[in-house]
Amino acid sequence: KEERCRILEEMGVDILLECPLTEKIRHMKAENFIKEILIGDLQVSYVAVGEDFRFGYERKGTPAMLKEFGKKYGFHTEVLPKEMDGRRKISSTFVREELNRGNMEKFRFLMGTDFSVEGIVEHGRGMGHKYLLPTTNLIPPVEKLMPPNGVYITVSHFRDRSYQGITNVGHKPTVGGEKFIGVETY
């Protein structure tokens, strides 16, 4: 969540409001979401959505519905066309497929940014430091989708400085017997 907020801030988003998915919201009809949340709570003047955007209970809300309500209640709705990569629509499924393949160049093209993972440095056994090759170990959040196990050229950022490195995603090679998947950067 923090990583997503940071990325949106870097993209120029000034204010980010998150709508918690409560039972009330989950079962709210699209019309009620527009009236209660968009108009009532947020008093929107402009809404931008993708052409395949759906919202409301049973995904019955559509961009056309937003436009219709916008005319009635005085807000503008802009429907953005899908971005394409050749003949294929760029979607979260497409992005996940490329990440799962380890196609980091395609991932970067589709997302407009490099893959990144954030976390707290975990102290290991100090074996890398002992052999004059210190490493940084991160345990990625469980919900973080990671590329396949392998070795990647990376850049690490720490205290306003950047460091080039090589990162192993997978079982930690410097420590025998580890069963968890980690991120170890040299």
Residue map of PLM features:
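A conserved beta-strand->alpha-helix junction
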Residues: 11-24, 81
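Phosphate/ribose-recognition catalytic cores of enzymes acting on nucleotide-derived substrates
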Residues: 124-186
